[in-house]
Amino acid sequence: MDLHHPLLKEFPEHRETIQWLKVSDEQFRKKFDEYHQADDKICRIEEEIDFATDQETDELKMRRAHLKDQLYRQLRGATNAAVR
């Protein structure tokens, strides 16, 4: 079972927009990097490479979900702006 949730896999329909925003929007890139760092940390915990309390793991998962929501909103906004 694949534990990782990379944005390109989560939102394949936004692949080009993700690539464009990573190089053109510093705020997006920072959130993108933070999302992937959280995702990597969660996977390391779930694979028992790193250790964390249940509370720490839950907080990290909530942070990842919040970042994913923010990034998705930004992707939708950029996609809608490109369509106009």
Residue locations for each model-derived region?
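Extended, charge-rich alpha-helical interface modules
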Residues: 1-84
